[in-house]
Amino acid sequence: MQATTIHFVRHGEVHNPDHILYERLPGFHLSDRGRRMAEATARYLAASPQTNTAAAIYSSPLDRTRETAQAILTALNETRMARNEEPLELVTDQRIIEAGNNFRGTRIGHGEGALWRNGNWKIVTNLWKPSWGESYRQIAARV
C-alpha cells in the first residue's frame, strides 16, 4: 500500500498595521515580506524531490492562504511543465479555514488589547476552547 504524505504550510506574514485579530475576516492579504516568504517556500518545495511531486494543492478561501498557495502552485507547476506533466489547480476548501475566535476584529496586543479587558483572560485560559471560540471537537467535526 502506498503511503500518502500531507504537507501543511502556514501562510506568509500578513499586512496588518492595526494589529487586528483578523481570523476569518476578508481583506487581509500578504505583506511584501509575506509574499517573499511564500515565494521562498514555493522555491524550496519545487526544488525538493520529496515535495515537487504533489498531487494536489489545497487552501482555505482566505486571501492570505490563497496567495501563499498560489505562489507554491506556480512554482510546482513550472517543475511539472518541465517534466511534461499536467499542471495542478488550486482547490479551495472551507473546511480547512482558520479556527473561529471570539476576539475576531479586535486589537489584542500592546497592553490595551481585548485580552486584558473585562475579564477576557478567563476566555483565553479555557483549555476546552483553545482558540477562544471554536473547540477542538468543532474543528475536528468540520475537517
Residue ranges and their predicted role:
Residues Q2-N84, R137-A140:
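Active-site-proximal alpha-helix that buttresses catalytic centers in soluble enzyme cores
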